[in-house]
């Protein structure tokens, strides 16, 4: 049986893969749930997503993990999930990574709560290296931050706020790149936003560390000025930074320092986002607009070819998590 599809003038691409989404399920489903999240993913061209573990309860046990995976099977896409690195996101005691892997965890992350204890991170990386799994890190040292979600710079000065400096990200990226080099662990630097962090990932890769990096569409399209125009809708962790940072992110995409585009799709309710800037939660949606932003901001200006964009949105994320998707094959 042979079926021929006339695709002249069209682009044939694999289903997109997003390794960083928040579907808020269980426990926070007034914001989003697995089914509405999967629908948004499908509308944006994504056929595989990896959910983060910061739900209520946290995905630090097999029961909660199984719930997410079973609900995911009821959708029209492949819904995978990371489990937490630390129990209760407390950064003190490691989860049963081996057991959670056997139960179906795609990898591990405490995304949303940066891990502050260096020796604990080293221990987790050693275990991840033994198990040949991926650890993903939210890199923001809270000791440098007074108001998260807004870059510490000209816009925060205008608003009279001490925000989140790039140093908060840079310091943890440097730490974790070096721990990854020492342990041989495979790690993902999540939602990279600082130009200096891009430079450190570039150096770590040259040194032989198994460091991957992801960037969001909002970080390669917008700057901190968006906060003045859009208020809480432009508040996210890490924050939008300067035009220099944005250009450095694009350079990182061009030279392969940044391997993946991931949305960090993080919906909140309308009521939450209507709160004052310093009180509203951080987060922005992205699944439905990611591909369009990539084409408009990266392909059309000539930064990436369409094939390179597809690699960063399908092949590379699938390769990181050893998924059987993200490529076009016969069969």
Each model region followed by its residue ranges:
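Metal-associated gating/positioning segment near the N- to mid-region
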Residues: 8-72
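Divalent metal-coordination and catalytic microenvironments
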Residues: 9, 20, 41, 45, ...
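Gly-rich Lys/Arg/Thr-decorated short loops/hinges at beta-loop-alpha junctions or inter-strand turns
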Residues: 18-21, 46-51, 78-80, 152-161
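Short, surface-exposed connector motifs at secondary-structure boundaries
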Residues: 45-50, 76-80, 104-107, 179-186, ...
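Acidic (Asp/Glu)-rich catalytic clusters
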Residues: 68-74, 97-102
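A glycine-rich helix N-cap at a beta->alpha junction
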Residues: 70-85
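Histidine/acidic residue-rich metal-binding segments in metalloenzymes
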Residues: 94-261
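His/Asp/Glu-enriched, well-ordered alpha-helical/loop segment
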Residues: 158-186, 233, 254, 259-261, ...
């Amino acid at each position: 049986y042979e079926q021929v599809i006339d695709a002249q003038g069209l682009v044939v691409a694999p289903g997109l893969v997003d390794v960083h989404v928040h579907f808020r399920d269980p426990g926070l489903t007034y914001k989003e749930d697995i089914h509405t999240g999967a629908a948004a993913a499908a509308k944006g061209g994504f056929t595989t997503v990896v959910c983060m573990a910061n739900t209520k309860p946290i995905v630090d046990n097999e029961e909660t993990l199984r719930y997410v995976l079973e609900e995911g099977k009821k959708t029209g896409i492949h819904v995978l999930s990371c489990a937490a690195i630390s129990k209760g996101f407390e950064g003190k005691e490691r989860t049963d990574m081996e057991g959670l892997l056997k139960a179906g965890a795609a990898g591990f992350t405490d995304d949303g709560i940066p891990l502050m204890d260096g020796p604990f991170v080293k221990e987790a990386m050693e275990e991840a290296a033994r198990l040949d799994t991926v650890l993903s890190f939210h890199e923001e040292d809270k000791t440098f931050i007074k108001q998260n979600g807004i870059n510490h710079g000209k816009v925060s000065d205008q608003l009279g706020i001490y925000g989140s400096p790039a140093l908060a990200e840079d310091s943890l990226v440097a730490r974790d790149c070096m721990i990854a080099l020492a342990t041989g662990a495979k790690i993902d630097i999540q939602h990279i936003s600082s130009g200096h962090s891009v430079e450190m990932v570039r150096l770590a890769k040259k040194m032989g560390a198994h460091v991957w990096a992801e960037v969001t569409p909002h970080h390669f399209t917008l700057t901190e000025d968006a906060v003045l125009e859009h208020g809480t809708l432009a508040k996210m962790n890490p924050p939008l930074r300067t035009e220099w940072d944005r250009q450095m992110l694009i350079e990182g995409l061009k030279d392969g320092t940044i391997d993946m585009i991931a949305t960090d799709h993080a919906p909140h309710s309308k009521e939450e986002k209507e709160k004052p800037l310093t009180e509203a939660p951080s987060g922005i949606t992205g699944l439905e607009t990611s591909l369009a932003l990539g084409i408009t901001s990266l392909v059309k200006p000539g930064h990436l070819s369409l094939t390179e964009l597809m690699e960063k949105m399908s092949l590379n994320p699938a390769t990181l998590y050893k998924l059987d998707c993200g490529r076009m094959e016969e069969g």
